[in-house]
Amino acid sequence: MSDMSDLEDDQTGHCGSGEHSGPFDPKRHAREQHNALERRRRDNIKDMYTSLREVVPDANGERVQASRAVILKKAIESIEKGQSDSATLSVDVAEQESKNAKLREEIARLKAKKDPSSSQSIIQ
């Protein structure tokens, strides 16, 4: 049998394995379809792991190729760090907004003290 036997068999409509002599073997066709679908699924997962490894800090700088478990672990660590940093920054923003509001009030108070007629205009 040549490497092209499957292609030749598909073109003639006959099964190359000799299992069935009919023009079309539904079981073989279903198996081939399933195998092709499974191969595409595995390729897609492999591509996604590669993409994830490239964007996750510390997973792309290793000399040896990181295992899938290491890639997922690093991704989880990166996400958790990002969430922690985000929470910390949110607290910092709230503190700065509070300080700004107090400073605006102080500016308005000092302006009113300096010029009582301008007490109506508050800095926004």
Curated annotation (Swiss-Prot):
Keywords: Coiled coil, DNA-binding, Nucleus, Transcription, Transcription regulation. Disruption phenotype: RNAi-mediated knockdown increases lifespan, which is abolished on an mxl-2 or mml-1 mutant background, or by simultaneous RNAi-mediated knockdown of daf-16 or pha-4. RNAi-mediated knockdown causes delayed onset of polyglutamine-mediated paralysis. Residues 29-42 are annotated as: Basic motif. It holds the Pfam family HLH. GO terms for cellular component: nucleus; RNA polymerase II transcription regulator complex; transcription regulator complex. Residues 1-10 have a biased composition (Acidic residues). Residues 32-44 have a biased composition (Basic and acidic residues). Residues 86-113 form a coiled coil. Expressed in D-type motor neurons. Transcriptional regulator which binds to the E box motif 5'-CACGTG-3', when in a heterodimeric complex with mdl-1. Involved in the control of lifespan in response to dietary restriction, the decline in protein homeostasis associated with normal aging and may overlap with the insulin-like signaling pathway. Involved in promoting infection by the microsporidian pathogen N.parisii. Required for the expression of svh-2 and the promotion of axon regeneration after injury. This is Max-like protein 1. The gene is mxl-1.
